């Protein structure tokens, strides 16, 4: 088969025009084109047919050294990347090239990054809880298999540690794999995450096949084309794990979904499209929908997505986060105020919520205990001004009891993490859902009113708190 070869006629920033004259056949929209700058391969993606046998492309890599007249080869298909278990423990870029310096990824399975969402008949409509082993999440903002979770958190509140614990726990409890897509990541943060995963055993360098995670990075310094597509590359690997013969529960992290939108906006502007509200691309809802609709459960397995979301200027009505919210099933909010108390994970129990915290799905007991816990914490929050100004002595006996229970609940919402054992010295705890519900039920009913507050801090189950209380006496 003869290769379809064109030549670069124009380069403007990350946009490249390529003219095909040999046989009059133009590459299809979204096809990957290849050109070489010395020995470096540069991948271009066809975005528009602009007439005169010319296609307009978006570059997936730096354009340094490319000039007009360079030959470009049509690959005949969209961007294709290696998928399957060979990607575990490895870092690749948007076009599937390894960037961890450990040689080629030897996978027999190669897949296009563009796929339709699963057919309606193949999708699973069951809503099953994905038990994470993290008490505060499982009780108050439970995740569903195949659900989409928004993770809101600033710098230094424990977002990375929470992500790694979720990776660790899902792998242990469900035998699942994880895919991490760094979209517009700081290179330093991506590097830190990789080394922390090695230290905590999530990535096994000696035996990569025993690793639990595959990483796909499109860093902040990459062209907008790479940042706009890297989430799709990560999702393609996650889909391959989900659709394996035995079926898998896969965890898919995107950090940061806002940067996916931002990169799409840059690409749109470079292609000369008229912007919509606040300068975003006119196809914002479509781009987001195409990504989010592929994140779903099928009869084989599930992809549960945790998406870090940056909110520009804390404006929740901004089109980028507002478009993301429409797809979310649960929100996990990390609070700096809670982190300052030394309570980790620093999940805000009142701001975090989940659509599946419903008695029809989680059961009457779980729902009732969760709402009682939130009620106690909300009452404590409303009493804090009085406590600050007048002190505890001015409260009624009933309010004093509520405050005491709330402080115990706050501390019991903390727990030691497996991935933090290295620097805390405390053994990590995976807490079953039944133990979580039983522990908090006892707390709100007053069964443990006689135990000291300190007994509930950084323990797993309520039995551990009772044992700890005996050592404190």
UniProtKB/Swiss-Prot annotation:
Name of the protein this chain belongs to: ATP synthase subunit beta
Reactions catalysed, as given in the entry: ATP + H2O + 4 H(+)(in) = ADP + phosphate + 5 H(+)(out)
Subcellular location: Cell inner membrane
Pfam families from the UniProt entry: ATP-synt_ab (PF00006), ATP-synt_ab_N (PF02874), ATP-synt_VA_C (PF22919)
UniProt xrefs under InterPro entries: AAA+_ATPase (IPR003593), ATP-synt_VA_C (IPR055190), ATP_synth_F1_bsu (IPR005722), ATPase_a/bsu_AS (IPR020003), ATPase_alpha/beta_chains (IPR050053), ATPase_F1/V1/A1_a/bsu_N (IPR004100), ATPase_F1/V1/A1_a/bsu_N_sf (IPR036121), ATPase_F1/V1/A1_a/bsu_nucl-bd (IPR000194)
E.C. number(s) listed in UniProt: 7.1.2.2
Enzyme class: translocase
SUPFAM superfamilies recorded: C-terminal domain of alpha and beta subunits of F1 ATP synthase, N-terminal domain of alpha and beta subunits of F1 ATP synthase, P-loop containing nucleoside triphosphate hydrolases
GO function term, MF aspect, one: ATP binding
Glycoprotein in keyword set: no
Function as written in the Swiss-Prot or TrEMBL entry: Produces ATP from ADP in the presence of a proton gradient across the membrane. The catalytic sites are hosted primarily by the beta subunits.
Keywords recorded for this protein, A-Z: ATP synthesis, ATP-binding, Cell inner membrane, Cell membrane, CF(1), Hydrogen ion transport, Ion transport, Membrane, Nucleotide-binding, Translocase, Transport
Quaternary data: F-type ATPases have 2 components, CF(1) - the catalytic core - and CF(0) - the membrane proton channel. CF(1) has five subunits: alpha(3), beta(3), gamma(1), delta(1), epsilon(1). CF(0) has three main subunits: a(1), b(2) and c(9-12). The alpha and beta chains form an alternating ring which encloses part of the gamma chain. CF(1) is attached to CF(0) by a central stalk formed by the gamma and epsilon chains, while a peripheral stalk is formed by the delta and b chains.
Membrane-topology descriptor: Peripheral membrane protein
GO CC terms in record: plasma membrane; proton-transporting ATP synthase complex
Keyword Cell membrane found: yes
UniProt family annotation: Belongs to the ATPase alpha/beta chains family.
Binding site for ATP: 153-160
């Amino acid at each position: 088969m003869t290769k379809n070869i064109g030549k670069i006629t124009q380069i403007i920033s990350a946009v490249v025009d390529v003219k095909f004259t040999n046989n009059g056949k133009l590459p299809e929209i979204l096809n990957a084109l290849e050109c070489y700058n010395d020995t470096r391969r540069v991948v271009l993606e066809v975005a528009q047919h602009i007439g005169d046998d010319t296609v307009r492309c978006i570059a997936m890599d730096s354009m340094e050294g490319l000039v007009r007249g360079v030959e470009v080869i049509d690959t005949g298909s969209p961007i294709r990347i290696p998928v399957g278990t060979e990607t575990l423990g490895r870092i690749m870029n948007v076009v599937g090239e390894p960037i961890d310096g450990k040689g080629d990824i030897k996978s027999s399975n190669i897949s296009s990054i563009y796929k339709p969402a699963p057919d309606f008949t193949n999708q699973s409509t069951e809503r099953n809880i994905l038990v994470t082993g993290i008490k505060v999440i499982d009780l108050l903002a439970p995740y569903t298999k195949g659900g989409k979770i928004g993770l809101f958190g600033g710098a230094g509140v424990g977002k990375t540690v929470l992500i790694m614990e979720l990776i660790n726990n899902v792998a242990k409890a469900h035998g699942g794999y994880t895919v991490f897509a760094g979209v517009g990541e700081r290179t330093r943060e991506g590097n830190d995450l990789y080394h922390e995963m090695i230290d905590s055993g999530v990535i096994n360098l000696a035996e990569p096949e025993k690793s639990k995670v595959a990483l796909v990075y499109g860093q902040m310094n990459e062209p907008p084309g790479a940042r706009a597509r890297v989430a799709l590359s990560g999702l393609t690997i996650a889909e391959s794990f989900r659709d394996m013969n035995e079926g898998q529960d896969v965890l898919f992290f995107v950090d940061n979904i806002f940067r996916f939108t931002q990169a799409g906006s840059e690409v749109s502007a470079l292609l000369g499209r008229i912007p919509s509200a606040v300068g975003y691309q006119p196809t914002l809802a479509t781009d987001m929908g195409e990504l989010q609709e592929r994140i779903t459960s099928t009869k084989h397995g599930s992809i549960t997505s945790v998406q870090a979301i940056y909110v520009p200027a804390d404006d929740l009505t901004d089109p980028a986060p507002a478009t993301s919210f429409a797809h979310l099933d649960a929100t996990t909010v990390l609070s700096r105020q809670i982190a300052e108390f030394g309570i980790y994970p620093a999940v805000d129990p009142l701001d975090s919520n989940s659509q599946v915290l419903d008695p029809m799905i989680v059961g009457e007991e779980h729902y009732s205990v969760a709402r009682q816990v939130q009620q106690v914490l909300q009452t404590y929050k409303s009493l804090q001004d009085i406590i600050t100004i007048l002190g505890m002595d001015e409260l009624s006996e009933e309010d004093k009891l509520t405050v005491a229970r709330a402080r115990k609940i706050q501390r019991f919402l903390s727990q030691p993490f497996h991935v933090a054992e290295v620097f805390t010295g405390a053994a990590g705890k995976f807490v079953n859902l039944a133990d979580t519900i039983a522990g908090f039920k006892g707390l709100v009913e007053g069964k443990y009113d006689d135990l000291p507050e300190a007994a509930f801090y950084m323990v797993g189950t309520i039995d551990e708190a009772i044992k700890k209380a005996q050592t404190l006496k």
